[in-house]
């Protein structure tokens, strides 16, 4: 079963991982260079050993595919995946005049009183993003992250490259090409991004009427982030296969620094002690032909049964 390869990764890191410091000052157990393979013919790889919020996964992917990099669209779909990074930019600006939010991510974990204050400031921030278009334009923006690089890569001549549209056209017209690649890692833009791309580059491969995808991910938060990435890129593969008239093949997930944060170890052990359920099936609206026409209601998982969700703090 596909989920087992993910559980094997988590178990291997706990048993063999190296303890390392990190940018967030949380600490991680880490391995370098790990690959997982998921046969998409066997079902959709949405984890069942903990409940996964598929609504957030599909709305984030559609946000990327729109070429958007502002959290307003996500908030309109009740998706808070990127809130902390936009909020961090705001509280570091001269326009923020509220309570001290220094190191809010760690303080909210350790100080219950501060957590209440932080959550109220975050609520006010999100409400203002939704209500005030000008404020959203300034402080909801995350920089030239995934969507911008996928759909509007800036060239030296001032033009833009739509990598997603180009790769779809190449799959249709030259499926044997070894250049079916999309990159989100633009060294010139990295300093201006709220979070430089963790999933940096992906490549498609067509064989025997099936579309496969390999992702290279430079950094993988194995408990919180990687399960999202697996489902997101599996969904992307299905969507592009749908438009190009192909079946799905494999999703291959290659990780650089694969890590478990030190404050996620208990949660990972809880998950590893659980039993798996059968993989769900993915439904795509057959009336939609282009991936750019899909909305959240056009994508569903069917027969999804899982163990309960497991909460864990996000390292910002």
From Swiss-Prot:
**GO-annotated cellular components:** cytosol
EC id: 2.1.1.45
Task: Provide the family line.
Answer: Belongs to the thymidylate synthase family. Bacterial-type ThyA subfamily.
Reported function: Catalyzes the reductive methylation of 2'-deoxyuridine-5'-monophosphate (dUMP) to 2'-deoxythymidine-5'-monophosphate (dTMP) while utilizing 5,10-methylenetetrahydrofolate (mTHF) as the methyl donor and reductant in the reaction, yielding dihydrofolate (DHF) as a by-product. This enzymatic reaction provides an intracellular de novo source of dTMP, an essential precursor for DNA biosynthesis.
- The transmembrane segments are none
Where, by residue number, is the active site?
Answer: 198 (nucleophile)
Picking any one GO biological process from the record gives: methylation
Q: What HAMAP family does the record point to?
A: Thymidy_synth_bact (MF_00008)
Positions binding dUMP in this chain are: 23, 178-179, 218-221, 229, 259-261
Sorted alphabetically, which keywords does the UniProt record give? Cytoplasm, Methyltransferase, Nucleotide biosynthesis, Transferase
Record keywords: Cell inner membrane included? no
**Reaction(s) catalyzed by this protein?**
dUMP + (6R)-5,10-methylene-5,6,7,8-tetrahydrofolate = 7,8-dihydrofolate + dTMP
Which pathway does the protein contribute to? Pyrimidine metabolism; dTTP biosynthesis
Query: Which species is listed as the source?
Result: Latilactobacillus sakei subsp. sakei (strain 23K) (Lactobacillus sakei subsp. sakei)
Assembly and partners?
Homodimer.
Protein name, UniProt field: Thymidylate synthase
Main localization (coarse): cytoplasm
Lineage: superkingdom: Bacteria
Record lineage: Bacteria, Bacillati, Bacillota, Bacilli, Lactobacillales
Does Cytoplasm appear among the keywords?
yes
Q: Which residues bind (6R)-5,10-methylene-5,6,7,8-tetrahydrofolate?
A: 221, 315
Q: Which PROSITE patterns match?
A: THYMIDYLATE_SYNTHASE
Q: Which subcellular locations apply to this protein?
A: Cytoplasm
Q: Name one GO molecular function term.
A: thymidylate synthase activity
